[in-house]
Every structure is written in C-alpha cells, then in structure tokens.
Amino acid sequence: MKALIDAGVVKFGRFVLSSGIESPFYVDLRRALGHPDLVKWVVSGYLSALSRLKFDVLLGVATGGIPYASILGYLLQKPFGYVRAGAKGYGTMQAVEGADVAGLAAVVVDDVLTTGNSLINAIKAVREAGGEVVGALVFLDREQCGSQNVRRETGVEVFSVYKMRELLETLKPYIGEGHYRAAVEYLAKWSC
C-alpha cells in the first residue's frame, strides 16, 4: 500500500476537488497507470467487485474510468466503451462511445467517487442511449455522500472496491498521525 503514496496516487495537503470541495487528501488513480504493479492490483480489486454483477457491457466515465473499463472489458471479453462528460457537438453527437448499449445491461465504471455527479450524468447518458444500468463501480468511494446521491437520483447501486476510511486505515503507517487525523476528522463532517 505504500506504493500508492510513492506513486502519488494518494496525497495529503490542501486540495480543491473538481466539485469545488476543499479536501486534506487527494486520490488520483490515473497516477497508477504509470505503475504496472499498481494497475494489476487496482484491476484485481475491480474484478472482485464486478463478480457480484451480471452485465453485458462496461462503460468508463471520462476520464478516470476509461482506462479501467477498457482493461476490464478486455480481460472479461465484454464489450466496452466510455461516456463523455457531454455529447460531442460534431459527427454523431453521441455521449456514449465504443460499444453499442441499446438493450444491454451496463456497468458504469469510474475511479473515484465524491459527490456522484459524474456517475449520475453518465447513468443518464447510458439510459438515453437505450442501455440499462445495472450498477456503478468505483475503485474508491470517498464517503462524501456520492453513493447516496447516485442511488437517490438514479436508483442505481454503487459498488466500491475501497471506502476512504478503509484506505486510510491501511495507509496509516505510511502517512503519519497528523495526516491520518486530519483526513478522519474531515470525513466525520460528512453525514449522508
């Protein structure tokens, strides 16, 4: 697990997230892509979580979910594609690219879940393209109400490989008491 720190996947300090929320930690799973051993570990976690779901197609959420949905689709020999943040304004003007999803059971894959807005938008896009979303899968749920927001807005269950508190416990020996305490206190402020 120290490799997550060494590779810069998990960082501690002051960060502003894409949601505009300030956080004492940042998780950037894209950094794992430069480390094959970490990719193998991350994909193994995703595969374990996916074993609970029956689906036809995997769709990565742009951009963090795309590489992992692609790897998973290849390994499982399932069609895969991705969901853009918005439909492109040219060509076919689609929001869902790659695999055709019409009439298929889809799992939407993302890397990190905070508020759930990216997943909510992706689920809506898949439904608009005729797909049935049977689950959403993230590697890390930051435990900031994202899974509850997704369920409330879409009815879709979010599955995660890790919850942030679990990850913090695992990383505690490598991050120091101050960072650990700041992160735990920060998470305690979130009640869903």
Curated annotation (Swiss-Prot):
Its EC number is 2.4.2.10. One of its GO terms (molecular function) is magnesium ion binding. Keywords: Glycosyltransferase, Magnesium, Pyrimidine biosynthesis, Transferase. Orotate binds at T114, R142. It catalyses: orotidine 5'-phosphate + diphosphate = orotate + 5-phospho-alpha-D-ribose 1-diphosphate. Pfam families: Pribosyltran. GO terms for biological process: 'de novo' UMP biosynthetic process; pyrimidine nucleobase biosynthetic process. The keyword Glycosyltransferase applies. Its cofactor is Mg(2+). Pathway: Pyrimidine metabolism; UMP biosynthesis via de novo pathway; UMP from orotate: step 1/2. 5-phospho-alpha-D-ribose 1-diphosphate binds at R84, K88, D110, D111, V112, L113, T114, T115, G116, N117, S118. Catalyzes the transfer of a ribosyl phosphate group from 5-phosphoribose 1-diphosphate to orotate, leading to the formation of orotidine monophosphate (OMP). Homodimer. This is Orotate phosphoribosyltransferase. It comes from Pyrobaculum calidifontis (strain DSM 21063 / JCM 11548 / VA1).
